[in-house]
Amino acid sequence: MADTKEIKRVLLGPLLDNNPIALQVLGVCSALAVTTKLETALVMTIAVTLVTAFSNFFISLIRNYIPGSVRIIVQMAIIASLVIVVDQVLQAYAYEISKQLSVFVGLIITNCIVMGRAEAYAMKSPPIESFMDGIGNGLGYGVILILVGFLRELFGSGKLFGITVMESIQNGGWYQPNGLFLLAPSAFFIIGLLIWGLRTLKPAQVEED
């Protein structure tokens, strides 16, 4: 029987209290690369969440049968298989988004969040709790991605999901798009500001000297 309190903890904890990007500072590279548009940030969130959840589930199912000496290889094989499935589905049903995400879907296998949860949680916990932990961490990762993607697309081009929200001066509107938001360094600074804001609200997350 799944532990309801544990499921609630692993599902909701990563959203704010133990966010994989804001607190653990994991998965930052892809957060910089795929957040120029809200659409790609959302698709990447779904992809990482599915891979993390199902890899946790399958690894947890066979955790008692994996020799310690090859556990990392087994984990990577399971994660890589799921990444290939996600990549092929995107190419089949969302080809344009797949092209925009480029190699970053394939690089989910190297995402520290996916490997970290497999090793730290799935290898020690039952399947249902592990699955929910994967969903929680995927959503925690996604919250930051979506916020960054929202800000970058809105202020960088005046659009959301490719739809004009703030008409640019060139098209007779009032808004002057800020191209700096479309450059990778802007994502770095936005994530830094989000981390600062979160740790201001939750002082317990600040590391002691």
UniProtKB/Swiss-Prot annotation:
Domain of life the protein comes from: Bacteria
Primary localization: membrane
InterPro entries: NqrD, NqrDE/RnfAE
Membrane topology: Multi-pass membrane protein
Single annotated GO MF: oxidoreductase activity, acting on NAD(P)H, quinone or similar compound as acceptor
Record keyword Transport present: yes
Gene Ontology cellular component terms for the protein in this record: plasma membrane
UniProt keyword annotation of Nucleotide-binding present: no
Alphabetically ordered keywords of this record: Cell inner membrane, Cell membrane, Ion transport, Membrane, NAD, Sodium, Sodium transport, Translocase, Transmembrane, Transmembrane helix, Transport, Ubiquinone
Positions of transmembrane segments: 42-62, 66-86, 103-123, 131-151, 178-198
Recorded catalytic activity of this chain's protein: a ubiquinone + n Na(+)(in) + NADH + H(+) = a ubiquinol + n Na(+)(out) + NAD(+)
Family: Belongs to the NqrDE/RnfAE family.
Subunit structure, as described in the record: Composed of six subunits; NqrA, NqrB, NqrC, NqrD, NqrE and NqrF.
NCBIfam families: nqrD, PRK09292.1, PRK12405.1
Name of the protein in question: Na(+)-translocating NADH-quinone reductase subunit D
Organismal lineage: Bacteria, Pseudomonadati, Pseudomonadota, Gammaproteobacteria, Enterobacterales
